[in-house]
């Protein structure tokens, strides 16, 4: 059984027991969270596709950890003009473990 749900402007395909990395959620570590924007639920040969959301579809998860991703560097450069700017960015994330999928 798997489901596709939307969180943080992205769509994620998950199954029970899977741990995924999402955009930062303002929920404490160890707490439960429910995602109700479920786009699709598949259970064997039975596939339930929403229009746009599955009615009554819920993905339940538990927050495992919060953190920051790898640093990316942004460079702005003009040749021969002695001009260079460099900037870094680390995006916040939340790791969640999927505990249940229901339709």
From Swiss-Prot:
One annotated Gene Ontology cellular component of this protein: ribosome
InterPro entries, A to Z: bL21-like, bL21-like_sf, Ribosomal_bL21, Ribosomal_bL21_CS
Protein's UniProt keywords contain 4Fe-4S: no
Pfam families, per database record: Ribosomal_L21p
Disulfide bonds: none
Domain of life of the organism encoding this protein: Bacteria
Molecular functions per Gene Ontology: rRNA binding; structural constituent of ribosome
Stored SUPFAM superfamilies: L21p-like
Keywords in alphabetical order: Ribonucleoprotein, Ribosomal protein, RNA-binding, rRNA-binding
Gene Ontology biological process terms in this record: translation
Chain's role: This protein binds to 23S rRNA in the presence of protein L20.
Subunit structure: Part of the 50S ribosomal subunit. Contacts protein L20.
Similarity comment: family membership: Belongs to the bacterial ribosomal protein bL21 family.
Protein name: Large ribosomal subunit protein bL21
Organism whose genome encodes this protein: Yersinia enterocolitica serotype O:8 / biotype 1B (strain NCTC 13174 / 8081)
